């Protein structure tokens, strides 16, 4: 089975970025996804270029911070920050034109870094929200980049990065028997979503997921990869 161990939130803060790099260099993280509106993007890009074995994708955002583009009124509050939260499914959908404009701007900003765009996913899985399905399919095909699996994309296997995503490595699910849980999965490819990081002041101000990130670093650096993993 091909297993991709992806670290989300790259570039969110310096501490998160450092934790991801440690979980890659000293552990089993194989890829990460960069938030183009994060607080530590420039540093994250430098670290990625110093660690070329780390595959880097983009973590598309509509639910944290500020947009890259101007004039995307349906996406923002009066203070200029995104109006959507992790509870976006309870909210009215935005203008699809605004979503496409903003996500395209984020992808173009990524391409300016000189990094190779490996794959696409999103903060809080918002690309898996059914009103946005057509937008993510269009961008994946246009930029010729695979997307994190979601049930809304099950009829489009040609654009999915893997056949399945494992989201249970989170909160109380962070433990070192990860691969014992995975070995019975009957798929050829699977992505494990992770969130390693070190807690810094910026993270405390911008995320509710804190010290478990440091536990993730420790676990990801201690897990032994079984032979059946490609």
Curated annotation (Swiss-Prot):
The keyword Hydrolase applies. Gene3D superfamilies: Glycoside hydrolase/deacetylase. Mg(2+) binds at residues 59, 123. One of its GO terms (molecular function) is metal ion binding. Keywords: Carbohydrate metabolism, Hydrolase, Magnesium, Metal-binding. GO terms for biological process: polysaccharide catabolic process. The keyword Phosphoprotein does not apply. Pfam families: YdjC. Its EC number is 3.5.1.-. Its cofactor is Mg(2+). PANTHER family: CARBOHYDRATE DEACETYLASE, YDJC DEACETYLASE FAMILY MEMBER. Probably catalyzes the deacetylation of acetylated carbohydrates an important step in the degradation of oligosaccharides. Homodimer. Belongs to the YdjC deacetylase family. This is Carbohydrate deacetylase. It comes from Oceanobacillus iheyensis (strain DSM 14371 / CIP 107618 / JCM 11309 / KCTC 3954 / HTE831).
